[in-house]
């Protein structure tokens, strides 16, 4: 079982129950898909706004702009490594996720779910630094999202 800790830092995120439900469903589906359903761990999510996300992105990645999701693993895992007692932290910026969903013709909840799955995979050691890593991570995202009845987020990008 994984304990989910959610902090809502922006009034733009106006439905904490919906955030918890989406996170729980995305987390369970991801962990089951990776055969990690028996892991005992904890994950923290911060739902914030673009202004705060830009500050965090500048501080930790030297990029002075907002982004959709940032992940900070508790341990430096490689893909396939067993996670520890703390998975890590995921931060999601509301305005960026809303804008991307509209631009890509997706529902907000589907895109948010994708960002949470993406963040969880980063916490579990998956990356997209190389072409091979990106292909592996995107394929996992497609498979997990399909189990959540969400269309391929990369279909129009391929």
UniProtKB/Swiss-Prot annotation:
Its EC number is 3.1.-.-. GO terms for biological process: rRNA processing. Signal peptide: none annotated. It is found in: Cytoplasm. GO terms for cellular component: cytoplasm. InterPro entries: MetalPrtase_cat_dom_sf_prd (IPR023091), YbeY (IPR002036), YbeY_CS (IPR020549). Single strand-specific metallo-endoribonuclease involved in late-stage 70S ribosome quality control and in maturation of the 3' terminus of the 16S rRNA. This is Endoribonuclease YbeY. It comes from Bartonella quintana (strain Toulouse) (Rochalimaea quintana).
